[in-house]
Amino acid sequence: RDMLDDPDDLAILDGVLGLSSAFRREAIAEGVETLAHGEILLKLGCNLGQGYVIARPMPAAAIPAWLAAWRPDPSWLDQTPISRDDLPILFTWVEHRAWVAKVVGFVQGERNTPPPLQHQQCRFGLWLGHDARLRKDDHFTIKALEPLHIEIHALASELIALKLAGRSDAAMAQLTELHRLRDSLLAKLLSMLQ
């Protein structure tokens, strides 16, 4: 369930899917709660799932009518599994979401300490500085990621400084901008997986 925000959960899921493949079995994902969960599972090659975004619990007698009416979300159609070479991009996507969530948690008073703020030292920055450079076919996307990543870290540093200075309201007022920048960066990353 936390695979969208916890790199360790995504690693566990990847391992379970690898085991199911090794034993020639199909895994059924439990807890598919959002469209994003479904998209990531499909990218990992998991085509079977159950959860609230697919169907709420129902009596057995209601299943035939549900089967006749259910259609997958358009965002799930034509999804193809990513290659093993592209897994670092997916992990980077999750790690960046998790990092922003930690910044937001600190600003909102849900965490006692902020995450590391140096843009070169976060997992995304490390990927961008090394593994991303090896991807020749994504050169223009990667070039667009660098300034956006730096801008996100600069804003996060500003928000944390405001919070530490006792100006939580000013920091909270800028969370929408942090989310906008995050969403832009994540969309660029996902475009590399198409």
What function would you assign to each model-found segment?
Residues G15, L19, E26-I28, Q50, ...:
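Residues within well-formed alpha-helices
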Residues L19, F23, E30, Y52-I54, ...:
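Short alpha-helical scaffold segments that flank and stabilize functional sites
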Residues E39, K43, A65-Q194:
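Non-catalytic regulatory/interaction regions at protein termini and inter-domain linkers
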Residues R1-R24, A36-I40:
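Bacterial c-di-GMP phosphodiesterase catalytic domain signature
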Residues E26-A69:
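Cyclic nucleotide signaling catalytic output domains
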